[in-house]
Amino acid sequence: MESQFRPGFDVSQGAGGRASKFGDVVAPTSSTQLPGIILRIVAIVLTFISAVVMGAARQTTTVTGIDAETALLTSITVTVKSTYSAAYVYFVVANVLVFFYSVVSLVLSMVNKARLTSMSLPFSIADLLMVVLLFSSNGAAAAISVVAEKGQQNLAGWDKICNLFGGLCARVNAAIVLSMLASVAYVILVVFGMANLRRSQ
């Protein structure tokens, strides 16, 4: 009896080809996962160091001046901590939150590889929130650092303090730079996430 199927046409191969093609769209490849994993590890390291450096920033120095009451030369010991500034405290809290989120998202992205595509949108939204959090805290901390470096006599009557507490200002500025690098890493993560969403569609 003559076969009803056309020669050379294999139904199973055709279905398998379509399934394989569909699987390529849904399942993320290791080449697309690796940059995201590396960037999250970088963000973990940078935010951790930033929070520790900023939180531990303090300096004790001896200030010499003339007593206004006695008109005599006097010396006092002054200790300044980063936690005296609300902006610096906000910086530490923000970096700690981003650090914990980075750890959790890294674990989820490595454990649930099969469901990584379905989690791309939540990850992208959360990553964008981390970008906003980092940039806002970095901006607040940088503004206070500028005042500490240059003073603000015209509006608030604040004197500059970095000429007396140079070590404190150096550590604060280093923490801000590291946190800015972490925010750049998250910007790249958001771009990768949007690209993966577009590719999956």
Swiss-Prot record:
Please verify whether the record's keywords include tRNA-binding: no
| Chief place where the protein resides | membrane
Q: Which UniProt keywords apply?
A: Cell membrane, Membrane, Transmembrane, Transmembrane helix
* InterPro entries membership: CASP/CASPL, CASP_dom, CASPL
Keyword ATP-binding attributed: no
> Which ranges sit in the Extracellular compartment?
58-87, 149-173
Subcellular location per the Swiss-Prot or TrEMBL entry: Cell membrane
Q: How does it sit in the membrane?
A: Multi-pass membrane protein
Superkingdom of the organism of origin: Eukaryota
- Protein family: Belongs to the Casparian strip membrane proteins (CASP) family.
Describe, as the record does, how this protein assembles with itself and its partners. Homodimer and heterodimers.
Protein name, UniProt field: CASP-like protein 1E1
Tell me which species this is from: Musa acuminata (Banana)
